[in-house]
Amino acid sequence: MLDKEKVLTAADPELLFRDGNRHLETGEVHQAEACFRQALRLAPDFASACANLGYLLDQRGEQGEAEACYRRALALDPLQAQTHLNLGALLTCQKRFPAAEAAYSQALLIDPHFTAAWSNLGVLYAYMKREDQAEQCYRQALELDPDYAKARFNLSYLLLRQGRFDEGWACFEARDWHAPLAARMTCPRWQGEDLAGKSILILYEGGHGDMIQFGRYVPALKARGAASITLLCHPALKVLFTTLDGADEVIPFDQAFPAEKGDYWIPLLSLPHLNGTRLDSIPAAIPYLHPDAERVARWSPLLPREGMRVGLIWKGSPLHENDADRSLPTLDLLSSLGTVPGVSYVSLQKGTGEDEAKRPPPAPPLVDLGSKMEDFADAAAIMAGLDLVISVDSAMAHLAGALGKPCWLLLPDFKTDWRWLKERTDSPWYPGTLRLFRQKTRGDWATVIAEVRAALEGLAQQ
């Protein structure tokens, strides 16, 4: 840009606004912010610049100023449907649900065909457990735009949580988690064709827990006659997954994998759909993962010698969208478990929270093994020597279930994961293995832990 053009732009709010949008689209957020703020200095009532500055700040996590920008923009121009939507999304993240509902409703009053607003309102209603209304919103969005993948994906979670698997798995195919890997594949995606004598590459998806839960489908592919099955997985799962029946080769995703070879590829989480899984036909042959005997022998001497041995996991991955609700805020919430006679505790906490295992009481006395684990094969070997695992919703709970190790799962009331269904105290994914302890109200872990303590006391007395 010539110097003269720069001067003209710097004095023109509309040109600054356009430059800000261009910078925002290319990820140059600092330049975008400077453009929007300069535009507003020149034209304080520039509603669109105020709204876009709010969006930029919102994406950066500065929600206080972002909300102020949104509300200022709407005061200047109340007919900005997109800004009502953005404000609703911000309020939803802050759990200010009535205000969020009002914002989305206003967006739809302005534009009844606003598919994103219908979908977001559906998400909000699902959070509020108004599931009939949530479903109506998702279906309205899809009626307006049958190709709107976000609404279809959101609908899948609602249907799966309700056990309506036929349509739920079909809608779940709207996800795009595997898209970057899929773009590298040269062979066709498997759509249920005959696998006799064929090779297939299974792509990893989601987190460690997703991989462990849905790894159960690998033997089903072998039963269909697949000659060779290669499983791509997270590095920390590689050794553990070598014990998975049907997996001929296990490759961590940080290593090269044969994208150009094989007859078919498939994302792991598409296997329930292609296998026609229903609530009464979940592959549930437990265990389907196994501890390594040498590792068991190595970890066994480190376990408590006396009493019932119980493993504890009180935090999941901090990267999970619902971590603030599904993880315990502190290990100290489990302090009452330390007074149950005849029980010894082992920390299986790895990463976030593992430092708490070294704290003195009021936390229950722990043998800290989590900080020493290298991968999930180590965790499996430790669990082999335990009598029970008590865990928040985490990959470790899935590991216990897949190993056939009794596990008590502590679940939040807010955004309870779809896979634990509604109101059940058991799981058809891990029959006879998992017992679910659910919050009755959002954030109330004290009641859940009191129930766990009473159950643990009864078990220890046996």
Regions from the PLM with identified roles:
Residues 1-388, 393-462:
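Alpha-helical solenoid repeat scaffolds of the TPR/TPR-like class and their adjacent stem/linker regions
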